[in-house]
Amino acid sequence: MIDRKDTNRFKLVSKYSPSGDQPQAIETLVDNIEGGEKAQILKGATGTGKTYTMSQVIAQVNKPTLVIAHNKTLAGQLYGEFKEFFPDNAVEYFVSYYDYYQPEAYVPSSDTYIEKDSSVNDEIDKLRHSATSSLLERNDVIVVASVSCIYGLGSPKEYADSVVSLRPGQEISRDQLLNNLVDIQFERNDIDFQRGKFRVRGDVVEVFPASRDEHAFRIEFFGDEIDRIREIESLTGRVLGEVEHLAIFPATHFMTNDEHMEEAISKIQAEMENQVELFEKEGKLIEAQRIRQRTEYDIEMLREMGYTNGVENYSRHMDGRSEGEPPFTLLDFFPEDFLIMIDESHMTMGQIKGMYNGDRSRKEMLVNYGFRLPSALDNRPLRREEFESHVHQIVYVSATPGDYEMGQTDTVVEQIIRPTGLLDPEVEVRPSMGQMDDLLGEINLRTEKGERTFITTLTKRMAEDLTDYLKEMGVKVKYMHSDIKTLERTEIIRDLRLGVFDVLIGINLLREGIDVPEVSLVAILDADKEGFLRNERGLIQTIGRAARNSNGHVIMYADKITDSMQRAMDETARRRRLQMDYNEKHGIVPQTIKKEIRDLIAITKSNDSDKPEKVVDYSSLSKKERQAEIKALQKQMQEAAELLDFELAAQIRDVILKLKAID
């Protein structure tokens, strides 16, 4: 039994109070949520304090909240900020726990089976367990997640029913407790005591919960009764205090009791026989033998150990779901009345839409060639419409909301005024002829004042050439390309802020979520090349990178002004006018943001995002552009396959399928 606390309240801790148009945005969002509004958009300009507004809304509506970001880096930034705002509440982090992940796959052309291979980040696994246990124990929970939250996780009911509940005075034998711990996938290890393990010393059992990393629990027996329970330091054994109730959550999210396990095994056997019969009828004898051999091995492991590698592929039978029924996910661990906030929604909602198709095409190949039963297709991410069915109330947060969000609601709450009085930058267009010399002069002006520069190009080749040119001219410059992993990227941004170098060049990496107040100039090369990097939303996001410095300035190098450029400049000018009027009315002088340069947080040491690095709003492409992109990606996929880099090839293929899925 779990002692759930439903009366906790969120307590926001901040030295700031709402300012600019934050008070109006907070009040409107809260009133709409309390009035039962299902969906609304917070359209907040870069640097207006959207995260602070989100925190105020969470504190006032006091509902468990899921915040979804489109990659681990942004999720990590948000997690750190929410932890600071809510030190007394449960702020949790839920992203893919793989440092390295090669999905199970089969390549028919070369008859190559690629076994699933992965490396799990222990720190992130701990944080995932902490998230699910917090959701079942209390109401004041914020979970910051990536799109991993729409992947299958196991039944929350089985997970909750498997919790081992202990109290002083409870009658239970030591051996019964040991059996219970093994049933919920804890391992006995009297020497190497770490998460998900227990050790035994006479009448004393010490348990290290899967959601902790420093503190464990010591259960002392007197006969067949628990004498007392103490919290201890796992390393030193020092007693920290006595505990009146201890709930030990399972060491895995995929739990099934013995009764359900036997039912599941019967269904797996029946499905295997049907599949073998089907293959034999079609003359596919190798596939028939393969699926029987693999499935019988898994069944034996399930009977003996209660677990097998790839157990998630049998989750439909384990959970008692029907064919095609959506899997249980993190969303099912929340109570019905919870709040969802989608950060950078114009990117995140596109990811949520694209997850299902890429996963299914890979699994169908495994099923067709006898590596997996058809039920493996139901171990999958949610479709977008299934995600929508979980939504009770949702706030889309973006400076540039996408068409999908705009189609979901007419309620748009604008947040344009920055608490610092900073204005949207001035934007000017200059001819591309002679742009290198012109740009070099602008960079030198900024460097002399101790300011930094962002340059965004359209191609990798141009970025590399420009980097070489600027280095020859004596400029301290770095190029941030898509091969750079999360931790390195964070280090590069930190070095830029510290002045190790002055200019950062990128392609699609200098948009959402990169906040460097020292940057006063953003240069956009080939601004008139209409496409997914130079559409209205992309340009507004890029312009926003200069909005955290009082000297913010944007130069677009182009030979003509496209419709996207004009709309982006018009929107920036509209915001700038409103901001200037507000400053004049209230006597505010714009001040560059003073942002502490933090040490790298541990969770950013995980390896990159859940999806291929190239995350793009494909819905904005024309049909012709999509076809060209597909052709280019297919070539890259073939090259990766020839080099036996099947993981990269599979990632590129998923992007191609996402492109093809667009109507």
Curated annotation (Swiss-Prot):
GO terms for molecular function: ATP binding; ATP hydrolysis activity; DNA binding; excinuclease ABC activity. It is found in: Cytoplasm. GO terms for cellular component: cytoplasm; excinuclease repair complex. Its main location: cytoplasm. Residues 31-418 form the Helicase ATP-binding domain. Residues 627-662 form the UVR domain. Transmembrane segments: none annotated. GO terms for biological process: nucleotide-excision repair; SOS response. A motif (Beta-hairpin) lies at residues 97-120. Belongs to the UvrB family. HAMAP family: UvrB. The beta-hairpin motif is involved in DNA binding. PANTHER family: UVRABC SYSTEM PROTEIN B. This is UvrABC system protein B.
